[in-house]
């Protein structure tokens, strides 16, 4: 059995760890509320522009933007959204597991893949896996800014416009609630009205000043909105997962401290009993 001093040192070490995890839990809870507010603010706009862009895929117009044209897929692009930091449970590993499955699927179909990584965890994973990384952005902080994302994403959009890739996918973690986050993998381009729930009715819009300028601008905004929404969803998921993970760690530390105190008390009781036995034995010998 360990000595009383060793057990006391262990208890002190676990108590210090619990203080850290408790502080991280409180910080994550504060950041989680702000991240959820940003995510909820982005959702209505993202869903609306997704629906309008979906209607455009069924619209009656002579001009067809490349984002609306389906073509045979010889190469695909992937935008992978992960967190910059860890200590958020299985958030990143669950998403990366889905990404690996999709990458194997593309490989089995003979499709080449090029990746854009948003977040340090996904970037490191893609580097280790040997995937072709054409752009990446890290260090977004607690507040996502579209200006920081556009440069990395534009590389993929230019590749799509130039015919270097024939489809663009995005993987991120969707926020369901504080206790549940869901890894998702969606096709961003080419845009399909059926995929976003747009009715198959042939929509007939009146464009001012002309169809090309309106559609070009709208579809770029569609991509930007969905990228921003994905990052906002992922950040809300990250802070929620981190808060839950740190709470679990704090609770486990409390349990360990209780167990160690029980062991310490037993060791102390055994030492006292031994000393009393030695005293009694010595007195009897005299």
From Swiss-Prot:
SUPFAM superfamilies (alphabetical): ATP synthase (F1-ATPase), gamma subunit (SSF52943)
UniProt membrane topology term: Peripheral membrane protein
GO terms under cellular component: plasma membrane; proton-transporting ATP synthase complex
Alphabetically ordered keywords of this record: ATP synthesis, Cell inner membrane, Cell membrane, CF(1), Hydrogen ion transport, Ion transport, Membrane, Transport
Subcellular location: Cell inner membrane
GO BP annotations listed: proton motive force-driven plasma membrane ATP synthesis
Superkingdom: Bacteria
Molecular function terms, GO-annotated: ATP binding; proton-transporting ATP synthase activity, rotational mechanism
InterPro entries, alphabetized: ATP_synth_F1_ATPase_gsu, ATP_synth_F1_gsu, ATP_synth_F1_gsu_CS
NCBIfam families reported in the protein's UniProt record: ATPsyn_F1gamma (TIGR01146), PRK05621.1-1 (NF004144)
Complexes and interactors: F-type ATPases have 2 components, CF(1) - the catalytic core - and CF(0) - the membrane proton channel. CF(1) has five subunits: alpha(3), beta(3), gamma(1), delta(1), epsilon(1). CF(0) has three main subunits: a, b and c.
HAMAP family the record matches: ATP_synth_gamma_bact (MF_00815)
Family to which this protein belongs: Belongs to the ATPase gamma chain family.
Role, per record: Produces ATP from ADP in the presence of a proton gradient across the membrane. The gamma chain is believed to be important in regulating ATPase activity and the flow of protons through the CF(0) complex.
Entry protein name: ATP synthase gamma chain
Organism, scientific name: Dechloromonas aromatica (strain RCB)
Gene name per UniProt: atpG
